[in-house]
Amino acid sequence: MQRRLIASVLLGHYLSAFTALGIPLYLPRILADLAPDAPGWSIGVLFVLPTLCTALAAPLWGRWADRRGCRLSLLRAHAGLFAGFLLAGFSTNLSMFVLALIIQGTFGGAMAASNAYLATQFKDGDLSRALNWTQYSARLAMISGPILLGLMTAQGLGLELYRYLAWLPLLAFVMILPLPADTPRHQANATNADGPLNPLPTDMPRLLLVQFLFSFAMVVTFPYFVPYGEALGIGNDALIGVLYSLPHLVYLIALPWVQRHASNLLLPGLGLLAVSNALQFWSTQAEPLFALRLLSGAGMLLGFVGLHRCLSQRSRQGSAGRLFGWFDASGKWAGTAAGVTAGLVSQTCGIASPFLVACLAAVAAMALARPLLMTSREIPA
């Protein structure tokens, strides 16, 4: 039953994340068909709009999940994505499309909802590994989504892509329906259903700040990686795409072995991330880039595994929704801030400058993360 449960949650998350993470790359083409007179800056606004809505809504949905049930919240997330994608696919004007993106971001949030539900079914080491696998499904969607959707757009599909892909989160919804429900607060404690919820860990602000800096360090180098590669003399778009994807491929390939390690690898991961970004900032030739991207992937992998171990150690009965809601919101705010920062520093300090910013963010995360490891009890691998 446990294998079936985690397989259903992970596959459901992949199906929902496939469209959410894959289709934004093709927003310029979709917007050109839907609103050809829209200003260029509107692409950036539409790109971050669902993320901003999720960042704002995730803590509220987390609180709702703790009171009403995390499985119900997961069903809500898949249903919200289905509704948002379907409306986007039938949009006839820009206003309707914007509303669809707001619905997608506000009522979606499948990552936080999936992790919160898993936290009601697994504990300690089992939960830590489950969180690693939900991140695995996100990385897989991040790689496969743009490739497969690119093949579809090459056939002339545009806005109607949303219409067809809306059925993926609906399929995820159906897969979650037969899974066991957790015990929501209003059933577990009917005499005080509206009373105060169980408290979050006292060091939660520190954990959220480390998550913010870690996510920021990863994302800030994404937006301008193509012109960065071109500046190093790489003229092949496919090769730039491979180099861009390498860190995610490291996660997909090496996770089964790395997560068996008994100790927390968060600090080494942040250190590798800082070093790799510093070296990419100083690089003037393309030859070392392959090795440096692998090094970035190793840092990303160790960082995620370490963060998930810290998170699983702080998961408590009755607080999973808020814990993972705030954790996901922190990552979403980091992504938004990273996009803005990348645009500013690349225009003022050079196309490689986001890598220096990423290095500094990773170093700051290292300094803040040490107390998290000192206060955490070790959990079995």
Task: Please identify what each model-predicted range represents.
Residues 52-56, 240-261:
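Transmembrane alpha-helices of Major Facilitator/SLC transporters
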Residues 2-48, 204-206, 210, 214-233, ...:
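Helix-loop boundary and gating motifs at the non-cytosolic
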Residues 161-178, 354-371:
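Symmetry-related core transmembrane helices of the 12-TM Major Facilitator Superfamily/SLC fold
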Residues 319-349:
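A late C-terminal transmembrane helix in Major Facilitator Superfamily
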Residues 101-138:
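Cytoplasmic helix-loop-helix junction between adjacent transmembrane helices
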Residues 1-3, 181-211:
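Juxtamembrane intracellular "pre-TM" segments in multi-pass secondary transporters
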Residues 110-122, 302-316:
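Intracellular juxtamembrane helix-capping segments at the cytosolic ends
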Residues 72-87, 265-279:
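Structural signature of the two symmetry-related core transmembrane helices
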